[in-house]
Amino acid sequence: MNQVLTETRPIRLKGRSFLAMVLSPELPLDGWLERLDDLARRSSGFFLGRPVVLDMENLAIERAQLVYLLQALNDRGVWIMGVEGARPSLLGPGMPPAMRGGQPAADFEAPAGEPQANPGAPEPQISQAVRAPGHAVHAMPSMVITEPVRSGQSVYFPEGDVTIVGSVASGAEVVAGGSIHIYGTLRGRALAGTAGNTSARIFCRKLEAELVAIDGLYKTAEDLEPRFRGQAVQLWLDGDYMMIDTLS
């Protein structure tokens, strides 16, 4: 009887890095969840399809509270791919795995409360918010997109600047480690300086944005002065302030 021998093909395992958002909950959890709801309300679909890591490093809670938090996030459509900094006793079957070795980048924070703007204040418009510190990155490469970014599409380029020759539709997103240049209307979301670049800027021919962010400082449509909507503008950071001015 003949025996046919076949060579077993090995399973290929590869290491690969991916960009994920890190959420850092604070006590009391219900108050933090309310602020998260506010961010989601201000920018619809912000967490849709986005991988998220839960940072437990400075959060002293019990397992029952963690189960409650994970369920609350799941109910809000926030998918937790892993948990960082949690005690081993907190995690178990059916829960996200422990994550280690994450490399820091610009932090993601919900917009902070701010005072009402003075109608008589001179331009450029300044709005105060809290910004997490990052490490400046220089001499970045660039990416050029020669067509519009349609609703539901995302452009990720954490290595440097992104230029869009066209518009960014509502529900679309552009994420860049450096600056973002949009030669059209910005209706979706633009997140610049995500590699910790405090000198990053956002430029667009027409501002109708759902959300803009530079180095972790976020502003939603409700936070932006109405007089800048529909205008050609640039946005940048000056310390802990996001500044906006029209382009001549």
Curated annotation (Swiss-Prot):
Q: Note the coiled coil stretches, chain numbering.
A: none
Q: Which InterPro entries match?
A: CAP/MinC_C, MinC, MinC_C_sf, Septum_form_inhib_MinC_C
Pfam families found in the cross-reference section: MinC_C
Keywords for the protein's UniProt record, in alphabetical order: Cell cycle, Cell division, Septation
Q: Name one GO biological process term.
A: division septum assembly
Q: Where is this region: Disordered?
A: 94-125
NCBIfam families (alphabetical): minC
Protein's job: Cell division inhibitor that blocks the formation of polar Z ring septums. Rapidly oscillates between the poles of the cell to destabilize FtsZ filaments that have formed before they mature into polar Z rings. Prevents FtsZ polymerization.
The record's section on HAMAP family has: MinC
Record-stated family: Belongs to the MinC family.
The record's subunit annotation is:
Interacts with MinD and FtsZ.
Could you tell me what this protein is called?
Answer: Probable septum site-determining protein MinC
Q: Give the originating organism.
A: Brucella abortus (strain S19)
Q: Which gene encodes it?
A: minC
